[in-house]
Amino acid sequence: MASQTILELWPSSSLEEVQTIIRAVYKQVLGNPHVMESERLVTAESQLCDRSITVREFVRSVAKSDFYRNRYFQSCAPYRFVELNFLHLLGRAPQDQREVSEHIVRTVAEGYDAEIDSYIDSSEYEAAFGENVVPYYRGRSSEANSKQVGFNRIFALDRGPAQIDSAVKSAQLVYAVATNSANAIKASSSTVIGSGTEKRFKILVQGSKFDSPRRISTTEYIVPASKMTPQIQRINRTSGKIVSITEIV
């Protein structure tokens, strides 16, 4: 396996080196796309070139761009959106169902910007990349305090240099994360979505627009993984608050 190239911006970095870092951020955060001139963040690029922002803040600008929002937030299932946020911003796959549920709930309750900020402002991001290292796929090598299954899961999300992440809309780690197990890179042909082998999840919801002013109800929804996205959309339409999402063993 090829070694991982780590790119860092230094005070002495040349303009050519800064441009290399800009291209690397686009590739990492946007999931290896072709970025048209009209889609580039000209202002943020200029700010990075004159050092008025750090690489960390440039990453934030790219992750909050219309490019990222349209391809990953608006076009993908919530579970897939969270998977890719972990991959693009922290360089790893989610470790367990608690992590995924926490981020889905945050996205629903606090919004898109809060979800993106939660990765970039985390102590994990600070420890791994600091202010001026371009995020990279850390799951390709073993690290202290990382779960061994994460080493395998990264390959389910990162299929190599030819992959464009936005081309895959469905979640890749639902079963592996929910059961805290290693995953196969390709789903078994014997596993059929909607069959008895499909994992189910419990969504706990508090309140909705149908509740009386004096009574806030709590409702549990049991849904298969393939139906999670439309169920979350229905909950949002009733103004319900998602309290937790847990896998049913």
From Swiss-Prot:
Disulfide bond annotation, renumbered to this chain: none
Self-association and partners: The phycobilisome is a hemidiscoidal structure that is composed of two distinct substructures: a core complex and six rods radiating from the core.
UniProt xrefs under Pfam families: CpcD, PBS_linker_poly
Protein family (similarity comment): Belongs to the phycobilisome linker protein family.
Protein topology in the membrane: Peripheral membrane protein
Domain PBS-linker: 2-166
Coiled coil (residue ranges): none
Role of this protein: Rod linker protein, associated with phycoerythrin. Linker polypeptides determine the state of aggregation and the location of the disk-shaped phycobiliprotein units within the phycobilisome and modulate their spectroscopic properties in order to mediate a directed and optimal energy transfer.
An individual GO BP term: photosynthesis
Domain CpcD-like: 198-248
Induction: By green light.
Record protein name field: Phycobilisome 27.9 kDa linker polypeptide, phycoerythrin-associated, rod
Entry GO CC: phycobilisome; plasma membrane-derived thylakoid membrane
UniProt keyword annotations, A-Z: Antenna complex, Membrane, Photosynthesis, Phycobilisome, Thylakoid
Compartment(s) of residence: Cellular thylakoid membrane
InterPro entries in alphabetical order: CpcD-like_dom (IPR008213), PBS_linker_dom (IPR001297), PBS_linker_sf (IPR038255), Phycobilisome (IPR016470)
Thylakoid found in the keyword field: yes
Subcellular location, principal: membrane
Thylakoid in keyword set: yes
